[in-house]
Design a protein with these regions (language model features):
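Generic recognition of long tandem-repeat/solenoid scaffolds
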Residues: 8, 104-108
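Surface loops and adjacent helix of pleckstrin homology
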Residues: 109, 210
Length: 230
């Protein structure tokens, strides 16, 4: 399959979280096919509230989607990711439900500097594979009133919300109307209750691609090469 853009995700592929999240969002990035969504509170149209994040699947972004630079190939990007992952150590964290700028996500229960350091390393070391942002992409990003630092990141690194502005999160909804926020919060907590507050171990990264269907598909999952501190 040919892809329009690529990204580096954390995807808990062998975990209950992935099964729950794929069912919640309605898309399975590993199988590359729709996932059946369960019915929840009758006041909520789950298909509607998950429409925006659905195509990305259950994930946390480590390096945001980018076009492939001229002169490099997907296989070269995959090899470099594998080499990079050999130097990475597993990271422990737990999750809770949070509201971020009007949408809901799963976020770490405590600030995790190790995840931020991993993000920084991945963004920098794989940047040679990223094509510069197009004029249309720059216009689109700048509609969000970027700070000077964010605009500089956009120009230099292709994405504004990195490094100090990076925030590890697993998106579960689009923007939710105020009158539904409490109900949506309750439903998310109920649905994901089996995995909330549990310890997760990030021990692999995924290379994903955006197909011409607009959905993201897993190209490869790459395990970390270093042992956990424990």
């Amino acid at each position: 399959m040919n892809f329009k853009r690529y990204a580096i995700y954390y995807i808990p592929s062998n975990d209950l979280l992935y099964k729950l999240g794929s069912s919640w969002l309605g898309w399975d990035t590993i199988l590359g096919q729709p996932a059946s969504q369960l019915e929840i509170n009758s006041d909520i149209n789950i298909e509607k509230i998950t429409e925006t994040p659905r195509k990305y699947g259950l994930h946390a972004t480590i390096k945001a989607p980018f076009g492939l630079a001229d002169g490099v190939s997907t296989s070269e990007l995959e090899r470099q990711l594998r080499t990079l992952c050999l130097s990475l150590k597993p990271i422990e964290f737990s999750l809770e439900v949070s509201e971020l700028n009007g949408f809901f996500a799963l976020t770490p229960t405590v600030k995790n500097t190790e995840i931020r350091e991993l993000h920084t390393k991945v963004v920098c070391e794989l940047d040679e594979f990223r094509a510069p942002p197009t004029k249309d992409e720059l216009i689109k990003r700048r509609r969000n009133q970027l700070t000077s630092e964010q605009d500089q990141n956009l120009i230099k690194w292709g994405y504004p919300y990195i490094f100090r502005d990076f925030y590890f999160h697993i998106t579960l909804t689009g923007k939710i109307p105020k009158n539904l926020k409490n109900t949506v919060t309750d439903e998310i907590k109920k649905f994901f209750e089996p995995v909330l507050q549990r310890i997760f171990l990030m021990s692999e990264l995924a290379l994903v691609g955006e197909g011409h269907d607009g959905n993201f598909h897993v190209i490869c999952q790459t395990p970390f090469g270093q042992k956990s501190k424990k």
